[in-house]
């Protein structure tokens, strides 16, 4: 019952489309759940298959497909609801001085409840349709933080 309350935290009743949850039929303990393979060699997490969350923007249980660019970055902020900010560092060449300078871009990314993401984790994201005004990417894989070497410049 407690998991049901956490799933139903919005005003509207949250359910997966085309899945009919008939309360009168008692066939099995397992609830019906729709999930898919995101493709491109990314595995569907167990929490997406066995979980009870409802997220229409999830690449595994929602109506969003991954296509286009695949990027990697480090998580710098998890303050938004189901959205994180990743930092992508790169080197820019300055011809006058024949040297490189460090630059970075912050990219807002939608994160499914199937993943537990913390600041410092390295995530792989895939491009999808525009989810909001700024969000165009979705987390497809999470790697643990590299360790205490986060002050060093890492090229992805």
Curated annotation (Swiss-Prot):
Crosslink feature (Glycyl lysine isopeptide (Lys-Gly) (interchain with G-Cter in ubiquitin)) location: 15, 46, 56-57, 79, 96, 105, 133, 141, 148
Post-translational modifications: N-terminally acetylated by acetyltransferase NatA.
Classification via PROSITE patterns: RIBOSOMAL_S17
Assembly and binders: Component of the small ribosomal subunit (SSU). Mature yeast ribosomes consist of a small (40S) and a large (60S) subunit. The 40S small subunit contains 1 molecule of ribosomal RNA (18S rRNA) and 33 different proteins (encoded by 57 genes). The large 60S subunit contains 3 rRNA molecules (25S, 5.8S and 5S rRNA) and 46 different proteins (encoded by 81 genes).
Other noteworthy facts: There are 2 genes for uS17 in yeast.
Protein name: Small ribosomal subunit protein uS17A
Organism: Saccharomyces cerevisiae (strain ATCC 204508 / S288c) (Baker's yeast)
Pfam families on file: Ribosomal_S17, Ribosomal_S17_N
Superkingdom of this protein's organism: Eukaryota
Predominant location: cytoplasm
Gene Ontology biological process terms from the UniProt entry: maturation of SSU-rRNA from tricistronic rRNA transcript (SSU-rRNA, 5.8S rRNA, LSU-rRNA); ribosomal small subunit assembly; translation
UniProt-annotated location(s): Cytoplasm
């Amino acid at each position: 019952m407690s998991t049901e309350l956490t799933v139903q935290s919005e005003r509207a009743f949250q359910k997966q489309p085309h899945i009919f949850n008939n309360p009168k039929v008692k066939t099995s303990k397992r609830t019906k759940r729709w999930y898919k393979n995101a493709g491109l060699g990314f595995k569907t997490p167990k929490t997406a298959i066995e979980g009870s969350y409802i997220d229409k923007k999830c690449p595994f249980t929602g109506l969003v497909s991954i296509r286009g660019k695949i990027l990697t970055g480090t998580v710098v902020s998890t303050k938004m609801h189901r959205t994180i900010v990743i930092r992508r560092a790169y080197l820019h060449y300055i011809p006058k001085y024949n040297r490189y300078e460090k630059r970075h871009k912050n990219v807002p990314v939608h994160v499914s409840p199937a993943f537990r993401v913390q600041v410092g984790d390295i995530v792989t994201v895939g491009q999808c349709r525009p989810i909001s005004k700024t969000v165009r990417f979705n987390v497809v894989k999470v790697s643990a933080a590299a360790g205490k070497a986060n002050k060093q410049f890492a090229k992805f």
